[in-house]
């Protein structure tokens, strides 16, 4: 699981509001249950609902803080559905009682049920759902946010595999590129990316045309040990022949899962690099 960070909760208004309300509602139901249990007979079943819901709330805090809601969304929806049944039955057992402590506990469970319904609608929907996209747009850090919005405007070559200063950029033959080749080793930038003339002079220089020395050519990986599934559709940048397009739900073979760009191969044999935040490992 990814590292837990409180900024994922504090930077997400939806998560911060719903988690805060759920904790408050649970405290009301818990304290009301304790008082009611001291004053009069109290249904033991309600304690199970109290214990179950604190576990569910804790799980949602962990998943939200680690930004893995896409990975565990189905499991969360299942647990929340069971929790909705438990809280509803607890309300039915308490709300009609004359004791104010039981009614207070019932009010806490009613508020919990309302939050659970909202959570089910959120976690049970796909990331492409309009309401979820709207909610996620307010979050500062969110898994699966559009890569196009986070792509650097100046130069993004530094994060791609095989394009650092210390090693030659990744090369492809004409047969591998299927007619998408360009005359520049760095696609879209004749003579290299902007500012390349100011880089370390010890870096390898590449010709802008003609024959390229085969010793500088980086061979494509022969093994693709990982399987990944596309959670979004992606259209390759037409100015970069190294990228590949794929559709949502398509399964790809991946050779390396380090970095923001993964070397991938489609079912039709097409190879190239794909943004990692558009894929999920199987």
UniProtKB/Swiss-Prot annotation:
Biased composition (Polar residues) is annotated at 146-182, 201-220
- Name the gene that codes for it: sho1
Could you tell me which InterPro entries the record lists for this protein? SH3-like_dom_sf (IPR036028), SH3_domain (IPR001452), Sho1_SH3 (IPR035522)
Its record classes its membrane topology as: Multi-pass membrane protein
Q: Which parts of the chain span the membrane according to its record?
A: 15-35, 45-65, 75-95, 104-124
Q: Which residues lie on this side of the membrane: Extracellular?
A: 36-44, 96-103
GO cellular component terms, semicolon-separated: plasma membrane
What keywords were assigned to this record? Cell membrane, Membrane, SH3 domain, Stress response, Transmembrane, Transmembrane helix
The family this protein is said to belong to: Belongs to the SHO1 family.
Could you tell me the superkingdom of the organism this chain comes from? Answer: Eukaryota
Function as written in the Swiss-Prot or TrEMBL entry: Plasma membrane osmosensor that activates the high osmolarity glycerol (HOG) MAPK signaling pathway in response to high osmolarity.
Where the record annotates domain SH3, the positions are: 223-282
Positions in the Cytoplasmic compartment:
1-14, 66-74, 125-282
The protein's name is High osmolarity signaling protein sho1
Subcellular location, record wording: Cell membrane
């Amino acid at each position: 699981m990814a590292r837990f960070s409180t900024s994922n909760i504090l930077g997400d208004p939806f998560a911060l509001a719903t988690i805060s309300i759920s904790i408050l509602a649970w405290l009301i139901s818990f304290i009301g249950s304790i008082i009611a249990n001291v004053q009069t007979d109290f249904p033991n079943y309600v304690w199970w609902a109290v214990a179950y819901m604190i576990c569910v709330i804790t799980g949602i805090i962990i998943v939200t803080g680690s930004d893995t809601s896409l990975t565990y969304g189905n499991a969360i929806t299942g647990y929340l559905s069971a929790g909705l049944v438990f809280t509803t039955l607890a309300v039915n057992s308490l709300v009609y009682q004359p004791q104010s402590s039981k009614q207070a506990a019932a009010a806490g469970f009613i508020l919990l049920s309302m939050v659970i319904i909202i959570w089910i609608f959120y976690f049970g929907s796909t990331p492409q759902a309009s309401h979820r996209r709207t909610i996620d747009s307010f979050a500062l850090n969110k898994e699966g946010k559009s890569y196009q919005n986070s792509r650097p405007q100046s130069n993004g070559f530094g994060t791609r595999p095989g394009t650092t200063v210390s090693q030659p950029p990744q090369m492809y033959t004409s047969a591998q590129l299927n007619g998408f080749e360009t005359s520049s080793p760095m696609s879209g930038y004749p003579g290299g990316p902007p500012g390349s003339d100011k880089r370390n002079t010890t870096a390898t220089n590449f010709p802008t045309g003609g024959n390229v020395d085969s010793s500088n050519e980086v061979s494509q990986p022969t093994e693709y040990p990982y399987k990944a599934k596309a959670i979004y559709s992606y259209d390759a940048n037409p100015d970069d022949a190294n990228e590949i397009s794929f559709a949502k739900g398509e399964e790809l073979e991946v050779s390396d899962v380090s970095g923001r760009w993964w070397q991938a191969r489609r079912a039709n044999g097409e190879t190239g690099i794909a943004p990692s935040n558009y894929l999920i490992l199987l």
